[in-house]
Amino acid sequence: FLLTYYFMNRRYRNLLICLFTILLLGTYHATLYWLDRPRTSLVFYNVRGCPAVHCIESDGRSWINYVDTIPNEKRLKRMTANYWKHHHLLPPKEITGDCRYMVLNRQQQIISYHGCHICVINDNHWRNKTTVSPLYIQYLYLCKGYDGHLEELTRIFSFSYVILDASLSEYRRHLLESECKQSGLRFISLSDEGSVRFLL
């Protein structure tokens, strides 16, 4: 009788341990899925030669705004495939020019997404221009092609962050970093920090 009771009790204990382990694993995977779910956000990728702004919706839809008219999208897709899969993203809609959607608007390299404004600077279009009241944008995205200084852009824009793209030469990157520090501007260098995501 005692032997039977021992084995029955042991089987019951093992069953409880097994069920608890399954529950724990299920909770762990559910938590990981919840943490990795798509969230409304902006992503700037550390992909040299292909500057882009990725606008992501919480349902997995997204728009990837290429800065160059002939982008190296194959390189970007190859380097970001695991990230997109990890966060359960659908294939993004590719944008290379001005557009207008319900939540996304792009006009003359100024991208507006869920009330957040990003100005892409990849040429000298904004040099030597002034305005009575600077336009407020959250992110000033500096890419290869702009030869001026930050001071010129502060006459036109008021911004929270400067994003330095990986396409910038080392000389230009160090120069712009120095200007940011001197002006007390917050900046992120993608070459140093890697890709960054901002939740909206």
Give the ranges of each region predicted by the language model.
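A structural signal for short secondary-structure junctions
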Residues: 35-37, 46-47, 134, 156
